[in-house]
A protein has these predicted regions:
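Terminal, non-catalytic protein-protein interaction segments that mediate quaternary/complex assembly
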Residues: 1-151
Length: 151
């Protein structure tokens, strides 16, 4: 699916059919947990790549930051290797949960967001490595809470 998306972004960017889908029905019976984040639709507007992430379920405390971050980075990667600018990531979580007793975690005063930096020299999607990315100014809040995760 990734190869097809990359091909279309370069050769058919006006297409409204540039998407991935992780929901393989024939494999669901073998999975302990069905995919939560299951589809991304890419849309090119001018020279800007935008995306919509659909997710069937999400726990706000344990998964939101991971999901938003990893798919935002994916948009940046796809845009860079396709000669586009990264635009917006819209996110639709269909069954969002916030555990009781952890509201204080959500109400804490945040800190300034770090800067995301990606190696501008990478032009082949499959040549990205973990060293291709870094965060500058990351100052996380302490987090000692134990949050239960439902499987």
């Amino acid at each position: 699916q990734v190869d097809r998306v990359l091909y279309d972004l370069r050769h058919n960017p006006a297409s409204r059919r540039i998407m991935t889908n992780l929901y393989n029905f024939q494999d669901l019976h073998e999975m302990a947990l069905y995919p939560c984040a299951y589809s991304v639709t890419f849309n090119v507007s001018g020279r800007t790549l935008n995306a919509i992430l659909n997710q069937r379920s999400q726990d706000m405390l344990t998964a939101n930051n991971w999901n938003v971050t990893q798919y935002a980075v994916l948009v940046h990667m796809m845009a860079q290797v396709s000669g586009l600018r990264a635009g917006e990531l819209d996110f639709a979580a269909h069954a969002l949960s916030i555990l009781r007793g952890f509201r204080t975690v959500l109400e804490r005063q945040g800190r300034p967001a770090p800067a995301f930096v990606m190696d501008p020299e990478v032009t082949d999607f499959y040549r990205f490595t973990r060293d291709s990315f870094r965060l500058e100014g990351y100052d996380p809040l302490p987090f000692d809470e134990k949050i239960p995760v439902a499987i």
